[in-house]
Amino acid sequence: MAREGKRIRAAREGLEPMKLYAIDEAIKLVKSKASAKFDETVEISMNLGVDPRHADQMVRGVCNLPNGSGRTVRVAVFARGAKADDARAAGADIVGAEDLLEIVQGGKIEFDRCIATPDLMPLVGRLGKVLGPRGLMPNPKVGTVTMDVKGAVAAAKGGAVEFRVEKAGIIHAGVGKVSFDEQKLVENIKAFADAVAKAKPTGAKGTYIQRIAVTSTMGPGVKVEPSTVLTA
């Protein structure tokens, strides 16, 4: 624990805790402070002026990161017939219907994204208690309940990131890897922030996007000036 504390203190050196950095400078700092022996994920957190306990203040959506996420995303698809063939052709890792239901019910959940055709949602609905808490339940609002399974699989594999506001009014997501060049990370962050801005609910009052910070998996958080991220 002492070594971990020393590493964290060292990483925070040179950071001004109360300063709001321009996004370009913030990303340079995040990359320079990443010291783990693996390719850390660059993460964004956004504090929103919403209370998600109210239905008209829920924030949820999906963002297609222009430069991908750097993650290997495993995709499961509930589909039959030609749509199942489309899913396999698009690169889905596991495809099925009742057979896939049995696999998931048996506790084997080896996927990061779950897609379903609308006709199979009554079947998938039986898995609500399993998939729901893991954030894997297909939802038409984020494009994972669709007849275009080929497009949905391609999006998931290509860097589509789902987001949903948490109880404290915070959204966080991985937006790339520290190995990405700075400009690609900035482009991803701006695209993600823009998607969250466009998902502003009707019940939101006052300042919607209040605070933004970026960090790496093991690094310190860097506060960001929102105006340098938001395009509108």
Swiss-Prot record:
The gene is rplA. One of its GO terms (cellular component) is cytosolic large ribosomal subunit. PANTHER family: 54S RIBOSOMAL PROTEIN L1, MITOCHONDRIAL (PTHR36427), LARGE RIBOSOMAL SUBUNIT PROTEIN UL1M (PTHR36427:SF3). One of its GO terms (biological process) is regulation of translation. It holds the Pfam family Ribosomal_L1. Belongs to the universal ribosomal protein uL1 family. Binds directly to 23S rRNA. The L1 stalk is quite mobile in the ribosome, and is involved in E site tRNA release. Protein L1 is also a translational repressor protein, it controls the translation of the L11 operon by binding to its mRNA. InterPro entries: Ribosom_uL1_bac-type (IPR005878), Ribosomal_uL1 (IPR002143), Ribosomal_uL1-like (IPR023674), Ribosomal_uL1/biogenesis (IPR028364), Ribosomal_uL1_3-a/b-sand (IPR016095), Ribosomal_uL1_CS (IPR023673). Keywords: Repressor, Ribonucleoprotein, Ribosomal protein, RNA-binding, rRNA-binding, Translation regulation, tRNA-binding. One of its GO terms (molecular function) is tRNA binding. Part of the 50S ribosomal subunit. This is Large ribosomal subunit protein uL1.
